[in-house]
C-alpha cells in the first residue's frame, strides 16, 4: 500500500511514477485519488493540481476504474468551484477523449482478431465444435470477439458519459460543456445503436431538468451557479439538446422515446420567450410526422406535414430549394388524401393533446387540411402524379370510371419508394369513397360487379375476401350501411347515408320527395312576384323601416356576442393554462415516480448483479480449485483427467477418483509383488545353488586384488607425505630469514601500544575522579535540600498538631460542660421522683389506716351478729383483681393481686433500662448515643488520651 498521509501534492507525480515503475498501478491510482480528495488539496493552487488530476484521469482510464474517477471529478469540482470552475473542462474533455480512444482501439483489436481467425487456415473445414456453437448460438465469431474485447470498453465509455453529466449538471457556468457532452452521448448511442442506453440517457436528462425546474420546499437551494431557466440562452441550449434527442430517437426508431422527446420540446417551447429557429421547427414537424406515421395516426401525420409546409411557405423566396419544396408539398397533399373519413371520431382527449403538440388552435379534420393546402396553391408545387390523384379522388371521382382513371396514376406513384407507407391508407380511402358513391346510385348490385370495381392494379390490389372484410369492418365502424347476400351473390345498400361530407352524384327518389317543398320555396324566392313600381316602393320602405329598427338591436347583439366571445376566449385560455399546469404537474409527478421506480429497478438490478457476481466468483473459485486439483492429480501421474471436461465434477469427486485409483493401483501392485517375489525366490535359490562351486575361487581372486590395491594405496600415501614434508621444510628455511624483522616490528608495536594504553588509563582515572567528585557534590546538595524539606514538613506537622490539640481541648471542654449539664438534669429528676415517692407513701399510709378502720368496722358488725355486706359491695382498689397497685409494692412475691400488671415505676428505678433516660456516655454497647472522641475505643484517636492525631502521623 502506498503511503498516503504525508505526501505533498508537488511530489505526488514523482511517487506515482515510482509506483507504476514497480508495477503497482492500483496503489498509484489510490495515491492520486486520496491526494485529490485530501483536505490539503483545497488550499492547493489549481495550477499545481491540474497535472495531478490529468495523471489521475489517464491512470483511471487505463485501469478502467469508473467509480473512482467519478468521485475524483466531484472532489476536483468542489476544489475549483469557488475559484475557476471552468478548469474542469479540459479534464472532462481529456477523460472522454481517452475513453473514446480506448473504444476505437478495442474495435481495431477485435477486427484484427477476427481477420486472423478468418485467415488462419483457408483450406480448413469447420470442426464439429464450430458447428455445435453455430447451432446453439446466433452469434458469429466477430460478435463473440466484440463482446469479449469491445463491450467492456463500451460499458466504461457509457459510465463515463453518465459520470460526467452528473458532475456537470445544474451549474450555469458549465452549461456549454454539459451540452457538448450530451451531444457526444447522443452520437455514442447512435453510432453503436445503444437503444437501452439512449432510453436511460433521456431519463437522466429529464431528471436533471426536473431538478433544475423544481420549486417549493423540496427544491434544491438556489446558489450563484444554479441554472436559471428564465434565461433565454439557457433555455435555448436545453431546446437544442431536446431537438438533438428527438433526431437521435427517430434515427434509432425508438418511437415511444421520440414521442416523449416531442413532449419535452413542446414543454420548453411553451415557456420559452424566444421563438425557436425555423430550421429546428421544420425538423421538429418532420420528425413528428414520422412518429405519427409509425403510430398509424394519419390525421395528425397530415397535420404535421401541413405545419411544415406552412413554415416553408413563410421562408424567404429562394431560401428553400425547389425540389425540397415540391417534396414537402407532395407529402402534404398525399398525406391529406390518405386520411380515413372517420379519423375525427377518435379519442377527444388524445386529439386535444396532439393538437397542442402541433401548436394548432383546434383539432384538424380531413376537409380542413385539404382546404388549407389548396388555399396555399399547393397544386402548383406537387408532383404531377399526386396532382392527378387528387383530381381523381376529390374532383372527378366516379365509381364506374375510377378504376380506369387510377391505373396510370397508381403506376406512377408506385415507382416512388417514399410514397409506399401511403398505399394502404389510400386504398382504404378509395374503397370507402367507392362504396359511398355506389350506395347513392344503387340499391343493390351484383357482388362480382362490386369486386370488379374495387380491384385495382398493384400496389392497390386486393383479393375478393379482403374486399369483403373491408366492407364488414366499415359497416361495423358506421362508415357504410351494406349487406352482402352470398346466396344471391349481391350487395344491398341501405338508405341511411354516412355523414362523410363527400360530394353526392345524385339524390335518391326518397330525397327528391323529401326536399320537394324546400326546393319549391327556393325557386319561388328567386322569382319576383311584384311587378308594379308602387309595390316595389312599399317593399323598399318596409325594408328600410325594418332595417332601421333592427340596426340598433343587431349592434347591441354584436357587442354582446363579442363580449361573450372574449369572455369565452379568456375562460378557455384560463382553462387551457390550468390544464397545462395540471398536465405539467402530473408529468413532473410521473417523471418523479418513474425516476423512483427506475432507481428501485436499478437498485434491484444492482443487487441482482452483485449476487450474480458473487455466484460467478464462487463458481470461478470452485472451477479454479477443481482445475488446480486436476492438475495436481495429473502431475502425480495417478490418473489423467481432461481439464476441458470437468463439468459435473467437484473437488470431492476428483479426490474420490484419486483415492479409488490409488487403491486400485496399490492392489494391483501388491498382486504383482507377490507373483514377482515368488518368481524371484525360485530364481535366487537356483542362482545360489550354481554359485556355491564358484565362491571359493572368487574368494582367492578377491584376496589377491585387495592386496594389490592395498600396496598401491600405501605407496601413494607415503610418496605424497614425503613430498609435502620436503615442501614445508623448504618453506621454513625461506621464512627463517624474515624472523628478525618480524620480532623488531612486533617489539615496536608493543611499545607504542603500551604507551597509548598508559595515557588512556591515566585519562580514564582522571575523568573518573572528576565524575566522582561531581557526584559527591550532587549527593550533598540533594541531601541538604532533603533535610530542608523534611524540616519544613516537620514544622508544618508541629503546627498542625498544635492546632489539632487546641481543637481537641476545646472539644473536651465542651463535652465536660455537656456532662455536667446532664448530671444536673439527672439529679433534678431524681429529686422529683423522690418527692413523688414520698407523696405516694403518705397516700398509701392514709389508705392503710382507712382500710384498717373499715376492717375494724366489719369485725364489729360480724361480732354483733349482723348480716354480711353484699358481695357487690365496695372493695378498695388495692384489693381488686387487676386494680391499681402502688409502684413500691409491685414486683415482690407477696404482692397483692394485680401486682406487676403494668403499674407505673419511675424511670430511675426501672431495671434493664425500663425506658428511662440514660446519658449517651453511660450507655452500654454504644447505644447509638454520642461519645466524645477522647472516650472512644478503637477510634481514630485511640491511644492518644483524647488528643487529636493528624492522619499522616497515625500508625
From Swiss-Prot:
- PCI domain: from which residue to which, for each copy? 325-498
Query: What UniProt keywords are attached to this protein's entry?
Result: Coiled coil, Cytoplasm, Initiation factor, Protein biosynthesis, RNA-binding
Kindly report the protein's main subcellular placement as a broad class: cytoplasm
- Where does this protein reside within or beyond the cell? Cytoplasm
Q: Which Pfam families match?
A: eIF3a_PCI_TPR-like (PF22591), PCI (PF01399)
Report the GO terms under cellular component. cytoplasmic stress granule; eukaryotic 43S preinitiation complex; eukaryotic 48S preinitiation complex; eukaryotic translation initiation factor 3 complex, eIF3e; eukaryotic translation initiation factor 3 complex, eIF3m; multi-eIF complex
Molecular function as annotated in GO:
mRNA binding; translation initiation factor activity
Start and end residues of each stretch annotated as Disordered: 789-955
> In what ranges is there compositional bias, type Basic and acidic residues?
789-858
UniProt feature coiled coil, ranges: 96-127, 533-636, 752-860
> Which cysteines does the record link by disulfide bonds?
none
PROSITE patterns found in the cross-reference section: PCI (PS50250)
Q: Which GO terms describe its biological process?
A: formation of cytoplasmic translation initiation complex; translation reinitiation
Entry-linked InterPro entries = EIF3A, eIF3a_PCI_TPR-like, PCI_dom
Subunit structure, as described in the record = Component of the eukaryotic translation initiation factor 3 (eIF-3) complex.
| Purpose | RNA-binding component of the eukaryotic translation initiation factor 3 (eIF-3) complex, which is involved in protein synthesis of a specialized repertoire of mRNAs and, together with other initiation factors, stimulates binding of mRNA and methionyl-tRNAi to the 40S ribosome. The eIF-3 complex specifically targets and initiates translation of a subset of mRNAs involved in cell proliferation.
Q: Which family does it belong to?
A: Belongs to the eIF-3 subunit A family.
**What PANTHER family does UniProt report for this protein, alphabetically?**
EUKARYOTIC TRANSLATION INITIATION FACTOR 3 SUBUNIT A, EUKARYOTIC TRANSLATION INITIATION FACTOR 3, THETA SUBUNIT
| Name of the molecule in the record | Eukaryotic translation initiation factor 3 subunit A
Look up and give the organism this protein is from: Yarrowia lipolytica (strain CLIB 122 / E 150)
Instruction: List the gene name.
Output: TIF32
